[in-house]
C-alpha cells in the first residue's frame, strides 16, 4: 500500500491497529523483521523510488499487512512510536560532512517527542568514530538512557538481521556495534 500524505501529521492509529516501530533502511532488513514479527507494525521511511517499489512488491509477495512505506519526511504526532531503528546509516566520515550525520542533538530532540516513554532507540554502526559521536549525543541527551552498563554496547539482538552493508563490512577491525537506549522523558 502506498500512502498519499497531505501536510497533516501521519496518524498511525488510522493505519495500524497494533503497536508501531519506525525504521529508515533500504528495506531488506526491515522486511525480514516484519516477516518474523507479524504482530508488530512497521513504518519504513525511504526516499529512493526504486527501493520503495522493490519493497512494495515484496510486501505483496509475502502478503504483509504489518509493513507500510512512505516517501516523505516523517511528520507524526507525539508519543506515536514504541521504537526507532537505524542500522548502518551513512557515517559521513569526512569532517566537512559531519553536519549531515543523522544522530545529533536536534534529531534526538525530535525522537524523544515521537517515541513513547520507555520506548527504545536501536542503532547499529561499524564506524568507531561515528559510534563514539552517537554514544556521546545519546548519553548527553536529557531523555535517553543506555540499556547497558558495562560493556556500554549491546550485542546484536537475534531479531536484528544482518544488513547488506553489515555483510560488506564483516572484516577484521570492522565490528558492528549496537546501541540501545531507552526514552525516559
UniProtKB/Swiss-Prot annotation:
What EC designation does it have? 2.1.1.33
Q: Which PROSITE patterns match?
A: SAM_MT_TRMB
- A GO molecular function for this record? tRNA (guanine(46)-N7)-methyltransferase activity
Q: Which UniProt keywords apply?
A: Methyltransferase, S-adenosyl-L-methionine, Transferase, tRNA processing
Name any one Pfam family assigned in the record: Methyltransf_4
Annotated substrate binding sites: 94, 126, 163-166
Q: What pathway is this protein a component of?
A: tRNA modification; N(7)-methylguanine-tRNA biosynthesis
Is-annotated flag, keyword Methyltransferase? yes
Which InterPro entries does this one have?
SAM-dependent_MTases_sf (IPR029063), tRNA_(Gua-N-7)_MeTrfase_Trmb (IPR003358)
Protein name as annotated: tRNA (guanine-N(7)-)-methyltransferase
This chain's function reads: Catalyzes the formation of N(7)-methylguanine at position 46 (m7G46) in tRNA.
Similarity comment: family membership: Belongs to the class I-like SAM-binding methyltransferase superfamily. TrmB family.
Which annotated residues bind S-adenosyl-L-methionine? 46, 73
Which reaction is catalysed here? guanosine(46) in tRNA + S-adenosyl-L-methionine = N(7)-methylguanosine(46) in tRNA + S-adenosyl-L-homocysteine
| Natural source organism | Ruthia magnifica subsp. Calyptogena magnifica
Q: What class of enzyme is it?
A: transferase
What cellular component terms from Gene Ontology apply here? tRNA methyltransferase complex
Amino acid at each position: 500500500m502506498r500512502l498519499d500524505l497531505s501536510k497533516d501529521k501521519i496518524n498511525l492509529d488510522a493505519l495500524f491497529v497494533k503497536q508501531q516501530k519506525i525504521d529508515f533502511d533500504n528495506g531488506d532488513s526491515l522486511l525480514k523483521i516484519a516477516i518474523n514479527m507479524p504482530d508488530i507494525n512497521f513504518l519504513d521511511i525511504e526516499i529512493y523510488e526504486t527501493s520503495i517499489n522493490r519493497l512494495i512488491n515484496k510486501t505483496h509477495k509475502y502478503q504483509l499487512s504489518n509493513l507500510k512505506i512512505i516517501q516523505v519526511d516523517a511528520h507524526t504526532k507525539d508519543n506515536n512510536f514504541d521504537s526507532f531503528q537505524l542500522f548502518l546509516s551513512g557515517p559521513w566520515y569526512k569532517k566537512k560532512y559531519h553536519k549531515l550525520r543523522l544522530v545529533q542533538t536536534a534529531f534526538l530532540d525530535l525522537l524523544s517527542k515521537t517515541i513513547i516513554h520507555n520506548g527504545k532507540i536501536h542503532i547499529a554502526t561499524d564506524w568507531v568514530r561515528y559510534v563514539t559521536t552517537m554514544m556521546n549525543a545519546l548519553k548527553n541527551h536529557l531523555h535517553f538512557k543506555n540499556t547497558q552498563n558495562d560493556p556500554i554496547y549491546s550485542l546484536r539482538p537475534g531479531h536484528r538481521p544482518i544488513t547488506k552493508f553489515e555483510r560488506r563490512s564483516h572484516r577484521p577491525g570492522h565490528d558492528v556495534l549496537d546501541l540501545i537506549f531507552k526514552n525516559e522523558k
